[in-house]
Amino acid sequence: MIIKRDMRQDKRAAPKAPINENISAREVRLIGADGEQIGIVSIDEALRIAEEAKLDLVEISADAVPPVCRVMDYGKSIFEKKKQIAAAKKNQKQIQVKEIKFRPGTEEGDYQVKLRNLVRFLSDGDRAKVSLRFRGREMAHQELGMELLKRVEADLQEYGSVEQHPKMEGRQLIMVIAPKKKK
C-alpha cells in the first residue's frame, strides 16, 4: 500500500499564532491597536474590542501568565514581516573566497597580474586565498615561498589584512587575506 503525502505541506513556515476564537485562554493581557496597554481582560471582552475596531485579536506571547494578546490586522502584520525578511535577505552579501595560485619561481610580470587580481577581489569585498605550490625539489627551498608570500602581504597592506598566516598544507603554502572594512 502506497501512501502519498503532499510534500509542500512539510515545508510549512513557523506555526501561526492563534487568532480570534482560536485563543484558548480565559483571560488575556491586552494591548490595543495603537500599542497602549489595556490591561487584563476576559477573552470575550478582548474579542469584542477587536471586533469593534474591525481588527483581529492575535496571541503574541502564549508563555506569559496570562497570555499577551494584541489587537491588530493579522494579514497586514504577516505581509510586513515577510517584507522585512525579504529586505534583510536582499541586503545580505555572500562573501566568497577567491583563490590565486603562485609558484616559487613566479616572474615579475605574472606577479603583477596576480597582484592586480588580488586587489580586485579585496576591493569587491571577497576574501582571497593565496596558495603557493611546490613541485619536486622546490620543497627544499620553502623559504623562497615564504618570502614571496611576505611580499604579497606587504603589497596588499592597504587593501586587506592577513586572516590566516602562511602555513604548509601538504605541498602548498596557504595564506588567506580578508578585505579591509569599508567606512
Swiss-Prot record:
GO cellular component: cytosol; membrane
GO terms of molecular function: ribosome binding; translation initiation factor activity
Pfam short name (any one): IF3_N
Location relative to the cell: Cytoplasm
Gene Ontology biological process terms, A to Z: ribosome disassembly
Keywords: Cytoplasm, Initiation factor, Protein biosynthesis
Family matches, as SUPFAM superfamilies: Translation initiation factor IF3, C-terminal domain, Translation initiation factor IF3, N-terminal domain
Record-linked InterPro entries: T_IF-3_C_sf, T_IF-3_N_sf, Translation_initiation_fac3_CS, Translation_initiation_fac_3, Translation_initiation_fac_3_C, Translation_initiation_fac_3_N
Principal cellular location given in the protein's record: cytoplasm
HAMAP family membership: IF_3 (MF_00080)
PANTHER family xrefs: TRANSLATION INITIATION FACTOR IF-3, TRANSLATION INITIATION FACTOR IF-3, MITOCHONDRIAL
Subunit description: Monomer.
Family: Belongs to the IF-3 family.
Function, as annotated: IF-3 binds to the 30S ribosomal subunit and shifts the equilibrium between 70S ribosomes and their 50S and 30S subunits in favor of the free subunits, thus enhancing the availability of 30S subunits on which protein synthesis initiation begins.
Protein name per the record: Translation initiation factor IF-3
